[in-house]
A protein has these predicted regions:
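C-terminal cap/loop subdomain of S1 sulfatases and analogous C-terminal strand-loop tails that border
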Residues: 48-72, 89-93, 97, 102-184, ...
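Intrinsically disordered, low-complexity polar regions and short flexible loop motifs
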Residues: 187
């Protein structure tokens, strides 16, 4: 945000401008006859933020979710994702598939008809280089039975010293080394820490963190302890 007096009005104006830009893109696709053969995705990179005069609470931007940008709570990482592709994606369909942005490149390769993209685009001279993502094209196209699923999803934010890992409905958030466990099936706002009641699940998710984490002097986070 710029230094303006009416930050709420500026935010509303930015939303209106973005809406107009999306409309211009859609109109241009239609004018060129490409609207029926173009996959259009509207999404975001993170939840609401507070910097620069932003006021997430005023607009209710987090909805039913807790947390902000650079936090591992759902409000910081769960984002809108709208896909539009006439004659391919069923209008009005809803999916509860758990996926992440690194799934988009495999998805784009898949819908473009590129086979064996993992081998084609892996730099074998770089140790560990490869695709972490899974194509979500089957879900987009209504073929849920063919959809592969992640065993878990993982996040780190050094700015807030938080680590998050989700497996199914279980979500472990580590804040400055302290693990907190939530069951998103009945606690989407992440209010009730049930780590003490489920130490076995905590330990399973902590083991995932220790497997996924790579130490970095630039991006430091505090690892959790095992129960």
């Amino acid at each position: 945000y710029n230094a303006v007096e009416h930050t709420h009005a500026q935010f509303a104006g930015m939303i209106t401008r973005l809406d107009a830009y999306v409309g211009e893109i859609m109109a241009k696709l239609k004018a060129k006859g490409l609207d029926k053969n173009t996959l259009v995705i509207f999404t975001s990179d993170n939840g609401p933020h507070e910097e620069g005069g932003a006021d997430p609470a005023y607009f209710g931007r987090d909805g039913k979710l807790r947390g902000l940008k650079r936090q591992c709570y759902e409000g910081g990482i769960r984002i809108p994702f709208i896909a539009w592709w006439p004659e391919h994606i069923k209008a009005g369909s809803v999916s509860h598939l758990q996926f992440a942005f690194y799934d988009l490149m495999p998805t784009f390769c898949d819908v473009a008809g590129i086979r064996n993209f993992s081998k084609r685009y892996t730099n074998r001279t770089l140790p560990g280089d490869g695709f972490d993502g899974l194509s979500i094209a089957p879900t987009l196209l209504g073929n849920d039975a063919a959809q592969q699923h992640h065993d878990h999803l993982y996040w780190e934010f050094h700015e807030t010293n938080q680590i998050g890992v989700r497996r199914g409905d279980w979500k472990l958030i580590v804040v400055k080394g302290t693990p907190r466990l939530y069951n998103l099936a009945n606690d989407i706002h992440e209010d009730n820490d049930v780590a003490a009641q489920h130490p076995d699940i905590v330990n399973e998710l902590v083991d995932i963190i220790r497997k996924e984490h790579t130490d970095s002097p630039m991006f430091k986070v505090t690892l959790p302890y095992n129960n």
